[in-house]
Amino acid sequence: MAPYIEGRQRLQELTEDRPAIKEVGYSRTFAGIWDYTPPTFYTAENLQIKSGGRAIIMAGSDNVVRNNTIEVDGRTAVYLYGPRSLVEGNTFIVHMDPRDKAPLPAILKLRDADGSIIRNNRFIVKRSRLFRKKEEEPQAGINLLESRDVVIEGNVFEQIAVPVRKDTASTTTEYGNAVDSR
């Protein structure tokens, strides 16, 4: 089947009214259109990005975010959905705009990211003058949802209350990370 026909059918699937979640035993999993496992091999590399909101959102498996400088006004710079992502050598800077009321603020968010690797990145929070108290809303460097066997190594977290936040379903191996809370 030609690629444009496959893409057209996929777009139609995404726009049809379907339940977004289904019950499977005791846990909830995303239904067919929310399957992040097909390999997409997207790569964002050697970029300088400044954004008012999220700079990168990728869905699919085997994606790479490497050697970028990403600066955003909000609280989340990158959101990745899907397994086996590689995030390495980046500098993430967030300015913590208090108008951004996203729940569980984190510079890097991963969902269903089994087997992902996050290494040798720098996570920096620069608070807006409007931001009143450091304790108002704990900012995480990395937030994991439903993500198992994630390796987090060699990262530096600056002015971040919680370097890694994860739900009960997520598991990590963490080593060589540094927290600078000046």
Give the predicted meaning of each segment:
Residues 138-139, 150-182:
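Predominantly polar beta-repeat domains that present long G/T/S/D/N-rich surfaces used to bind, process
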Residues 3, 19, 24, 46-47, ...:
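Consensus "Asn ladder" position of solenoid repeat domains
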Residues 71-72, 76, 84-86, 93, ...:
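Short, surface-exposed, polar/charged, turn-prone segments marking secondary-structure boundaries
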Residues 1-37, 50-55, 60, 72-79, ...:
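Extracellular beta-strand/beta-solenoid scaffold signature
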Residues 7-11, 15-16, 37-39, 43-44, ...:
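Parallel beta-helix/beta-solenoid
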Residues 48, 53, 61-62, 69, ...:
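Position-specific detector for the leucine-rich repeat
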